[in-house]
Each structure stands twice: as C-alpha cells, then as structure tokens.
Amino acid sequence: MDYERQQHAPIYEALERFRKKRVVPFDVPGHKRGRGNPELAQLLGEKCVGLDVNSMKPLDNLCHPVSVIREAEELVADAFGAVHAFLMVGGTTSAVQSMILSVCKAGDKIILPRNVHKSAINALVLCGAIPVYVNPEVNAQLGISLGMEVSQVEKAMDENPDAVAVLVNNPTYYGICSDLRTIVKKAHARGMKVLADEAHGTHLYFGRNLPVSGMAAGADMAAVSMHKSGGSLTQSSLLLLNKSMNAEKVRQIINLTQTTSASYLLLSSLDISRRNLALRGEESFEKVAGMAQYAREEINEIGGYYAYGMDLINGTSVFDFDVTKLSIYTLGNGLAGIEVYDLLRDEYDIQIEFGDICNILAYISIGDRLQDIERLVGALADIERLYKKDSTGMLSGEYIAPAVVASPQQAFYAEKESLPMEQTVGRISGEFVMCYPPGIPILAPGEMVTQEIVEYILYARDKGCSMQGMEDPKVEHLQVLKGGI
C-alpha cells in the first residue's frame, strides 16, 4: 500500500475546491444548495446540502470517470489489495448484482449457498442464470446455517462442471466463514470464477487476526459494504476486481442499473472512509475486536444467553469466525431474538442490528465506545431478570432447505395466483418471503412450499419479525404459480 498517496481524498478535495468558488448553479439538483428547500437545509445543514451537487468536469462522472473519481478508484484498489475498484452508490445490493451479471448470462449455472442475501437471487431473476444451491450445515443448538464446506462445494462442482461461477458469503451475517482460499483454488482449477459477498466483511481487509478477505484469498470479485463497518454513508459500497476480470466490461454491466445521478455525498464518504481505513484501519479494528470480545465474555456471565465466537470453529462448516460480530443466542431465556430486539429498543433505547427467531446481532464497529457496550450488557442482564420465561414450544430453527422446482426468473415472470398461506403447501412460490434484516429468503421464486416452511413463516410473523418480499403486507396470502410450472 502506498501510504503517501493514501493520505489524499481526491473527490472530497475536489468538492472543497468547488465549494470555495461559490459557483452559481443553473443545473440540478433543484434545491440549489438548499435555498429552495429551507427545511431540508435545516435538517441536513447548509454544508451538507451545498455539497449535494451534479456531475461536472471538475468533479468527474461516475459512469465514465477520467479524473478525481478515477483516482479515488485507484486508491481504493491500492488500499484493498485489488487490481481495480468501483465506487457504488446503489448499496452492496448493486455490487452483488453487478458481480453476478458480469459472469452469468441466461442459462448459465452458478453455485451458491442457499443462505444468500436476496440481492443475489434477484440477480438471477434479472439475468436468467440457474442456481445450484449448496445447503449449508445447520447448527442445531443455535438454529443458524453455517458456511459452505469445501466438500459440499466440490461435490456441486463435480456434478455441475458447466457452472461458470461460485458465490461465497465472507462472512455470513452471524460471522461464519468458509474456507475461501481452498474454494477459490478448486474453482479456478475448473475454470470457474469466484465471487465473494463481503457485505459484512470490510474490516477483513484491515484488521489483524481476522478471517482472510476475498481479494487476499484470490477471489475474482468482491462486493464490500463500506457503510456497514467501514464508516461511510448508508448506501455506499465498493466492488473489487482481481486481475482475471475485464474492468471496463464490468463497468458496462454496472452502468446498466446504476444511477446516472450519483450522489457526491456518498462518493465523498467512500473517499474519506477509504483514507481513514488505509491510515488507521488496523488500529481501529483491533479496538473493535477487543470490544466485541469483552462484550461476549460479559454477556456469557449473565446466564441464559450464549454470545458465540471462535469456539464454533470446526475446520469445515465453520472454517473461521469474524470476532467483530457480536451474535447472541437468546432462547435460553425463553425469548426469541426478535423479542429481545424489540425490548432493547422499546424499553432501553438501544437499537441493535437485527433479531430473528433464535438470535440477535449487535453490530460493533469503528464508531462504538466501551460505555455503549456496558449499557448493552446491562440491558441484557435486566431483560434476563425481568422477562425470562419458559421456552417450551418455541421454534429453534432459522433455516429450512427448500426444493428448487423452477428457475427464479421463470417463476418470477410466470402467471400466478394468490392463495391463503395455509393452502399453498405443495405449490411453487412465485415471490420472495423473508425476515428483514437479514434479508435471506425463507422462500424464493421457484421453490416448493412445504408445511414446515408455512409454519415457520407464520411463527416469524406472529413473533414480530419484519416480513418482506410478498405482495400481501399482512403475510396472510402467498403468490404461487398458477397450474404448476
């Protein structure tokens, strides 16, 4: 890494030069530096709305960068150990979909874990690729799906030698990591590309004693959520490329769906955050890992909770663990994760990342403080004392392996009918059903509905999970394929 170059933030510096010129705007956006919308200026501040500007020669253009954005991309690539990098303003959803669209066309097969984010399956709807799912092992105690085992991936490769790519979560939402280096080696030996979904892995590029990053493992592409653990603004992300990819071809794919009016607030936040991580990331994430480990130890002293970590590593389905993730099993207190999630927010003014049926996740990152950790630990102890109940009759599984009957694209565009949820068993789903977060589909278009899946959906709904993907906001009806396939 070139530390001298990494001290620069070319987009931010260009914005500052532009701001000082006091240019009179006769272009968009129409709020004209906030003057046309005083309430917006009051909410965000005059400097913020003053930097919400349009693409122009001094500020470059994200769709075809030739100056400051191009330089910012080069600095990202240098900092992350990539050959090329793209700044993304459509979130990591856009980055994941661009990865898949760059390597898959209609009819191509892609090997991926079923516990992928909905953005990956949405990409299959867009391009018509065929998923070859690897159903990961499930930890029976925690009710969470683990990582893809090398043997599972190798079996899928052997059975589908015509597959063009393998997608790997690195890490999962819960912090679970697969043996990415070995998967890359075996995929490349078969001529397959490897895509790393690192929506929750920005820190892997800078922290010490953390799981291997996608680029370091030799993956061909990696989608990285800078806004999650890297400090940039929500919706800003990165797409990293290794030498095997044609960068300009990938840019063409990105430009199919990415906005032509990129936000300079998002772009400059990526620029500044990259500089911060390049110069101070190792120290910052060492502190993050220390806070997360301290929280784990304190929470496990309470009783009724299990804050898991490196103890899950088994060399196969849990090859490594991201110690910055504070994932906590809650059923020992007779409380679903979503119930603890709601209690923390409503009774203790603590907002955590998500709660599902069995677990909660508190996202620890560069903006956290030890006093905040202490407050979380205290609240969890209070909840254990005041709200603990019998866990009899509670579901304990987060993941049900579905049967794929039709491709996501085929099912998504097929003629459908709406049926009461209880009457859909044996039918083929025509839409997504998921708890969000984490956004991993319980059902995806083209998958068979089973009694177990219906019971899980209704249980999650009744426990208060935020359900998404369905046309029916009440989660009482499901769109299924009319007359089968």
Describe the function of each predicted region:
Residues 49-91:
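Conserved N-terminal alpha-helix of the aminotransferase class I/II PLP-enzyme fold
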Residues 143-203:
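Active-site phosphate-binding strand-loop segment of PLP-dependent enzymes
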Residues 212-251, 258-269:
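Active-site PLP attachment segment
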Residues 1-67:
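N-terminal "arm"/small-domain region of PLP-dependent enzymes with the aminotransferase-like
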Residues 294-469:
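Conserved C-terminal alpha-helix-loop-beta "cap" of PLP-dependent enzymes
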Residues 273-296, 372:
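Structural signature of PLP-dependent enzymes
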Residues 84-107, 123:
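Conserved beta-loop-alpha segment that forms the PLP phosphate-binding cup at the N-terminus of a helix
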Residues 108-168:
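PLP-dependent aminotransferase-like
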